[in-house]
Amino acid sequence: MLSIAEASSEAHVGSEVSVRGWVYRIRSSGGVTFIVIRDSTGIVQCTAKKNELTPEQYDEISSLGIESSLSLIGTMKKEPRSPTGYEISIHKFTVYQKNDVFPITKDQGEEFLLDNRHLWLRSREFTSILKVRSTIFRSFADFFYDQGYYQVHTPFMVSTAVEGGSTLFKVDFFGEPIFLNQSAQFYLETMIYSLEKVFTIAPSFRAEKSRTRRHLTEYWHAEAEVAWIDNREMMDVEENMIYYIIQRVIEENYDDLKLLGRDPEALRAMKPPFPRVKYSDIIKVANEIGMQLKYGDDLGADEERQITMRYCKPVFVTNYPKELKPFYMPQDPDNPSEVLNHDLLAPEGYGEIIGGSQRIWDYKELMQRIREAGLDESAYYWYIDLRKYGSVPHSGFGLGMDRLAMWIMHLDNIREAIPYPRTIRRTKP
């Protein structure tokens, strides 16, 4: 048994091949039934001729519905009029399940397709999305393995919030209130003292009532923490990682990108170095293009979208005002009102995909910032301990994998980038 991609080659022309899959399209004309079969590797046109099969066989195969499953044996030949240039003339077949009417047609609305995502995943478009997504995740891990990082695992249920409690999902844990994790950062920081360079890929949960095209309540988060490097060096790592992923996707999923309408060559142009622009300068850029922003305003989705339209590559926005960022980011020695951080904004209006920074490693500085933020010191005792025993300079970042996938594939909505999106209005299927 061959995959459709394996069978559809010059080497098999004139030979008998066996393939299996699902009916993608079917029509009959003049005693010939044309069936396009799909599997995970592609599609191939097959023909069943009435004069070469028994009446019962022809009636069975010509009456199959979309997404009926079958295996078949036939002769492979070249056929320039077929979708792929190859065609199988069917000799034998076995039907595993015959469908009548498949619920999804070409003219279904977005909400209907979300309600039936378990079936819509079979579409050629979504098959390509899943393949590209797989390459993105695998490439992220490969990049860091090649750089000597260790993959580690952290808990999903936590008692301490990384970035405040207003958007946490609260869970009753045997009578004790705990939360679904928003970031693995603190736990990753504990591991740099043994492994030095660590990363993880895991779901994160955010109880934000956002209805934008780039927000999910459950999303895939790739995070890394590294000992002995500063904010600038962390950005070096990130831009090389992003370009490595892009190169792998182009190499392994060129046809998938084309099917999705994404120009692979436009992606290939995203070569480092990426521009690095201070927040204060970004505010100036924003006002030049007509936005009413002042220093100290946070950049929302609309501001990021308009700003990134000015750049042909991802852009790092650095040195945010201290008040806009979490307590664990250190102040810039040259300008204490700013912190040593960075956000990476994807071009073409896609906005933030990475948030990262140097981390405060000095015990006294950390304690001061915790108190300034009005946080309960006892809740962070174990995080504080890291600064008491052999603390070192270190940096880290978090990457929204679904946002990265959305940008790489040039999708309109983040819900298209993940198999089963979870939003404030959707928990099924």
UniProtKB/Swiss-Prot annotation:
Gene3D superfamilies named in the record: Bira Bifunctional Protein, Domain 2 (3.30.930.10), Nucleic acid-binding proteins (2.40.50.140)
InterPro entries listed in its UniProt record: Aa-tRNA-synt_II (IPR004364), aa-tRNA-synth_II (IPR006195), aa-tRNA-synth_II/BPL/LPL (IPR045864), Asn-tRNA-ligase (IPR004522), Asp/Asn-tRNA-synth_IIb (IPR002312), NA-bd_OB-fold (IPR012340), NA-bd_OB_tRNA (IPR004365)
Pfam family, one: tRNA_anti-codon
One Gene Ontology biological process: asparaginyl-tRNA aminoacylation
Listed EC numbers: 6.1.1.22
GO cellular component assignments: cytoplasm
Keywords of this entry: Aminoacyl-tRNA synthetase, ATP-binding, Cytoplasm, Ligase, Nucleotide-binding, Protein biosynthesis
Subcellular location: Cytoplasm
Signal peptide positions on this chain: none
Taxonomy, superkingdom: Archaea
Catalysed reaction, written as an equation: tRNA(Asn) + L-asparagine + ATP = L-asparaginyl-tRNA(Asn) + AMP + diphosphate + H(+)
Family: Belongs to the class-II aminoacyl-tRNA synthetase family.
Protein name: Asparagine--tRNA ligase
Gene this protein is translated from: asnS
